[in-house]
A protein has these predicted regions:
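Short, acidic, small-residue-rich periplasmic hinge/interaction motif at the N-terminus
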Residues: 26, 67-71, 79-123
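N-terminal periplasmic accessory domains that precede
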Residues: 81-85, 133, 151-153, 196-199, ...
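Membrane-embedded beta-barrel scaffold of Gram-negative outer-membrane proteins
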Residues: 96, 347-351, 357-375, 519, ...
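Short acidic/polar hinge/loop motifs at secondary-structure boundaries
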Residues: 164-203
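Transmembrane beta-barrel wall of Gram-negative outer-membrane proteins
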Residues: 229-231, 236-267, 271, 275-314, ...
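Structural signature of Gram-negative outer-membrane beta-barrels, strongest in the C-terminal barrel
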Residues: 294-299, 308, 417-419, 427-429, ...
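Gram-negative outer-membrane beta-barrel transporters
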Residues: 467-470, 474, 483, 579-581, ...
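C-terminal beta-signal and adjacent terminal beta-strands/loops
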Residues: 534, 581-583, 689-694, 715-770
């Protein structure tokens, strides 16, 4: 065989062994070409061009690996003219399970406007309390007037206070922690060992009843695991702030695990009291203890029990008669805003078959609340030096002190059966609240008051999901509930006992929701829903009120939502547009109780109002690179309380409404930038915005809009993390509550009085995980 023949045979063999393989890589769903796909074999590599095309010199029997950020990596055998389809990976939010509904669903598939904070989000935001998450939630606000947020507004609907005489403990926004209803008790929202926070916007009454007419806030603490775990966190910061937390998790026996956590938190409260020469009159002194047990003897039965003690021994000294922005106060009587809650819950899930499950949820809580304050906000020295008010000349000292002590106990039991796409259940609740108040009550008519509310709630509900096809389904649920309320009140005037009040009422309420959901692909969904929520009626406590004005009826809200959700490997978008209509709105009015008696006008709650609301909510999460993540949220809200009239005195008709709802900023938003690298270094900055809003429905005073900027950076070294953080780094002054009334003697002109949110605070946190 000559040389030429041998060379030709050799080249032919080489061409077989090392042939040029070509092909195109496209998106499996859209079939659009993908640029920049990495293609590697054992000894060669390339990437696709702008048209998704590639060429590679490999044997046709070689194994090629195709990888691209945002897509699943696959291995294929090389052939010529390949057509490779890559499937997108869903961003982590697809894996987020929302627990608060009647059935657990992924965040992408749930047909509601929901903001979710995972354990990672909570840690990155440095949130020690739910208070610090509120600025990142579109269309959520909270009213100051307490040491920690208790009263929330979602889409402009929600209470601003619950002083003695303001009615029963009915709330428009539910606050639930580990299946324990703490509505109106949001001070207990400490973020220690919390794994997830879920905020539902819009009526959720068909799931949670009358306390969820405007929305629902749920906090879930970490569940015990079989593995050993131990965590330590310690913080020191300005305002004499320190925080120490511990977590321990262990397996006791097979199927039984325990998790124990505890936290001590303290700060002085950012106030300098001139009268008492102290800096801790507004202190936050908080303790949280929690124990959780998980028992799973087999694959069918799971029991999770939670026991919790929250003891918040906080002071309250947040107002000043000179409205200064230096956080100086002059009160000579110590205020208190404390909450001690002892609670437990037990959730049992039993799987009877692949399609049938039974769930039982039991909870009990008992809470002691004290809210007291110096009613005139100053001492005699201040009033004399600044306003020439001399007690010896006037014959009386300008001193007022109000105190309200509450004890609330609540027992709930829920039973639920899930049969395929059908869910049916029942709910029982017994709540008892006792109030003891002293001070200038009911415009000075009462000096001491005692009230007892006794609630019995019974409800039944059902939900069904019908699948028209693999991509289109209809979800419908309803809840019918009866409330029986008994109120007993006794009162003392300045020189005699006043007429006692005893009244009971019962009413039924219906909530429902229907939603169409279209799943465009594995990553994109749309929904359209219509829902009705409700808030229970109640009994007015005013001792001289006519019997016909004693009760007030339930309030209803009807809501239409359209939503869009897209969740990919490197970004997620959730957009909701909504409109709502409030019916039988509960408002505070006054009426002449005895004809011809000009002194018989008393304020009470009545169903005389209506209102509208509309807007949008947007949440965005974008992983730019493996090191950089951007987050953003936006809320737009347009509200209106329709005009209504009420009797102010014997000759004057007052006009209310015809303006936006109180505590309802038109715009809320946030933007976050997070960076971290492989060495353990990290940094994060957040900007939040809140538009101006009316402080109250009873006057036209408004807040100022404001931006806040927070910053943190640090380093992780093995199991330890050190974080330096700063909140409100530009020391912005922003009001969280405003009252409009006459305070300054001798003429007592009406003025706007403001209480401010936290100033700048800096600190250092050390976390260690075993």
């Amino acid at each position: 065989m000559n040389y030429i023949t041998k060379l030709c045979i050799s080249l032919y063999c080489i061409s077989i062994v090392s042939a040029q393989v070509s092909g195109i890589v496209v998106d499996a769903y859209s079939e659009q070409p993908i640029e920049g796909v990495n293609i590697i074999s054992e000894d060669a590599g390339t990437s696709t061009d702008a048209d998704g095309v590639f060429q590679l010199d490999v044997n046709e029997r070689s194994i090629l690996q195709f990888s691209h950020i945002g897509y699943h990596t696959i291995n294929l055998t090389a052939i010529n003219e390949m057509v490779v389809k890559l499937e997108e990976k869903v961003i982590d939010t697809e894996g987020i399970i929302v627990h608060a509904g009647l059935a657990e669903e992924t965040l992408q598939r749930i047909a509601s406007s929901v903001t979710v904070f995972t354990k990672r989000d909570i840690k990155e935001n440095g949130s020690e309390h739910f208070q610090f998450l509120t600025d990142y939630i579109p269309n959520l606000n909270w009213a100051g007037g307490t040491s920690r947020p208790r009263y929330f507004q979602i889409r402009g609907v929600g209470e601003r206070s619950h002083y003695f005489g303001e009615g029963p403990p009915n709330f428009s926004v539910a606050f639930v922690m580990d299946d324990i209803d703490l509505s109106g008790l949001g001070m207990a929202g400490i973020m220690h060992d919390i794994k997830q926070v879920e905020i539902f916007k819009g009526p959720q009454s068909s799931v949670y009843g009358p306390n969820a007419m405007a929305g629902l806030i749920t906090l879930w603490s970490a569940t015990p695991q079989d593995s050993f775990e131990s965590n330590l966190t310690a913080t020191y910061g300005s305002d004499n702030h320190y925080r120490l937390g511990l977590v321990g998790n262990a397996k006791i026996i097979r199927g039984l695990s325990i998790r124990v956590s505890g936290l001590k938190n303290y700060s002085d409260g950012f106030r300098e009291n001139i009268s008492k020469n102290t800096t801790n009159s507004n202190k936050r002194d908080e303790l949280l203890l929690r124990t959780k047990l998980k028992y799973q003897p087999n694959e069918k039965l799971v029991l999770v029990g939670t026991a919790m003690i929250a003891n918040l021994d906080n002071g309250y000294d947040a107002w000043a008669p000179d409205n200064n922005q230096d956080f100086k106060t002059y009160s000579n009587q110590q205020g208190q805003d404390s909450q001690k809650s002892t609670a437990f819950s037990l959730r049992a899930n039993l799987g009877l078959s692949e399609r049938m499950d039974l769930t039982s949820i039991t909870s009990y809580s008992e809470t002691d609340l004290v809210h007291s304050y110096d009613g005139d906000w100053a001492d005699d020295t201040y009033w004399y030096n600044n306003h020439n008010f001399d007690p010896e000349v006037e014959g009386w000292s300008y001193e007022f002190f109000d105190s309200n002590e509450k004890n609330r106990s609540s027992l709930t039991q829920e039973l639920r059966a899930s049969i395929g796409s059908f869910i049916i259940g029942g709910y029982y609740k017994h709540l008892k609240e006792q109030d003891n108040a002293s001070g200038y009550l009911f415009s000075g008519l009462v000096t001491e008051g005692k009230g007892i509310y006794d609630f019995n709630v019974l409800a039944g509900y059902a939900q069904y999901a019908y699948h028209f096809s693999s991509v289109l389904r209809l979800i419908g649920n309803f809840r019918y509930e009866t409330n029986k309320i008994i109120y007993t009140g006794t009162y003392l005037g300045y020189d005699a006992a006043l007429p006692p009040v005893k009244f009971d009422l019962e009413h039924g309420m219906l909530g429902f929701k229907g939603a169409f959901q279209y799943q465009d692909d594995n990553f994109t969904s749309y929904y359209l829903s219509f829902a009705q929520g409700y808030k229970s009626g109640g009994v007015n406590q005013q001792p001289f009120l006519a019997e016909k004005n004693r009760p007030f009826r339930p309030e209803y809200i009807q809501n239409v939502e359209m939503g869009f959700k897209k969740m990919m490997d490197n970004y997620s978008d959730r957009l909701t547009v909504f409109i709502g209509n409030r019916r039988n709105q509960q408002v505070s009015v006054s009426s002449q109780q005895v004809l011809g008696d000009p002194n018989s006008f008393y304020y009470f709650t009545s169903n005389t109002g209506s209102g509208q609301l509309g807007g949008l909510e947007w949440d965005h999460d974008h992983v730019i690179t493996s090191n950089i993540r951007l987050t953003a949220s936006l809320g737009y809200l347009d509200t209106k309380v329709e005009e209504f009239s009420y009797q102010m005195d014997s000759t004057t008709i007052g006009i209310g409404g015809n303006k936006a709802a109180a505590m309802a900023p038109k715009l809320t938003g946030s933007f976050g930038f997070d960076w971290r690298d492989e060495s353990g270094l990290f940094a994060r900055t957040d900007l939040t915005y809140k538009d101006n809003y009316y402080f109250s429905d009873s006057h036209n005073q408004i807040s100022n809009s404001y931006f806040l900027i927070n910053l943190s950076f640090g380093k992780t070294i093995d199991a330890a993390t050190i974080t330096f953080w700063a909140r409100n780094i530009f020391d912005k002054r922003y009001a969280i509550r405003g009252f409009y009334f006459g305070l300054i003697p001798p003429d007592y002109p009406d003025e706007l009085w403001l209480s401010y949110g936290d100033p700048r605070q800096i600190g250092l946190t050390f976390d260690y995980k075993l």
